[in-house]
């Protein structure tokens, strides 16, 4: 009887760990979005080293150089509010969960220079004000993917 109870408890433990374990160590997509694209505390600036520093600081040059990335210099509330705009088809995929900002936002585009190779990732820094298109998911909707600038 004791062995039977132990086997049942062990089976339940394995089952519970099977459900819980995949979510351990995996960041929610909204956290990835914030890490990769949000920089509300820095105004856009023309420092040519901005992208090199930020891409490294935010972990986008580990193992390889991320080719393109955009930082948004607006509050999280402003960016999150874009999710309440009209839904549209994304520019970079056929998904239909994208939303376009109603006004231009301050952004910095970082593009890997053609001659740059890992581990010496070297980026061009371009500041502008553009509408952004983001993918939103969840309930309530939150940004999970930066799709495009227009």
From Swiss-Prot:
Binding annotation for substrate: 35, 66-70, 91, 111
Q: Where is the active site?
A: 37 (proton acceptor), 145 (proton donor)
Protein's UniProt name: Ribonuclease pancreatic delta-type
Organism this protein belongs to: Rattus exulans (Polynesian rat)
The Gene Ontology terms for molecular function here are: lyase activity; nucleic acid binding; ribonuclease A activity
Signal peptide bounds: 1-25
Which GO biological process categories is it annotated with? defense response to Gram-positive bacterium
Tell me the enzyme class: lyase
Q: How does it assemble?
A: Monomer.
């Amino acid at each position: 009887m004791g062995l039977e109870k132990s086997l049942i408890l062990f089976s339940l433990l394995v089952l519970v760990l099977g459900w819980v374990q995949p979510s351990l160590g995996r960041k929610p997509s909204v956290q990835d979005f914030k890490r990769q694209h949000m920089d509300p505390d820095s105004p856009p600036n023309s420092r040519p080293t901005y992208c090199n520093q930020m891409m490294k600081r935010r972990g986008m040059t580990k193992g390889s150089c991320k080719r393109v990335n955009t930082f948004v210099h607006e509050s999280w509330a402003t960016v999150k509010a874009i999710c309440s705009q009209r839904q549209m088809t994304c520019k970079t995929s056929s998904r239909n969960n994208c939303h376009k900002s109603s006004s231009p936002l301050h952004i910095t585009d970082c593009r890997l220079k053609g001659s740059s190779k890992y581990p010496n990732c070297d980026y061009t820094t371009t500041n502008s004000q553009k509408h952004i298109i983001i993918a939103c998911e969840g309930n309530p909707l939150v940004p999970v993917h930066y799709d495009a600038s227009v």
